[in-house]
Amino acid sequence: LSEHFLCLTRWDLMRDNTLRFKQPARIRKNSHDAWIFKPPLPAKMLEKGGFYMGRPGCDGMVVYLATISGLKVFNPSEVVKAKHLHLSGHRTYGRRHRMGRDDIYMCVFPNDKIEFDPSKLMYKFGDPRQRAYGEEAIQRALDFEFGNEKHWYYAIEKCLRL
């Protein structure tokens, strides 16, 4: 696992004890709810990672941070199942708690392989309709890293004051 970072999309445990993959057609199709890595994390992740987990948007920020820190990010959620044991619909957050903006979010789509596949990465930047995939996504995130600093610090401040 050295230099790898697994981001897992959750499987919801339903009231009848069945599991449902949390990848609906339109909503939250790119969520990551659990992470597996071999410590220590890169210094950049520790320095910039001062935000609360569980806030809307934090999962995309974690993927972005891992990517710009040089880790190989992948999501083998079709074979590694992170079970979500939260049957209540109650949440302590809403849309206004969303952290950041697209420039500091990345997504890694689920698959059935336990190996790095850059084609599963997506980065939205600038206008939300601009997207890059694969190696281009990694390169764009690295190219825009310093220009995105203001977005990053705004997201951290917002997280800490809500």
Stretches with model-predicted labels:
Residues 1-64:
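Conserved catalytic core of nucleotide-sugar-dependent glycosyltransferases
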Residues 51-162:
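C-terminal catalytic/acceptor-binding lobe
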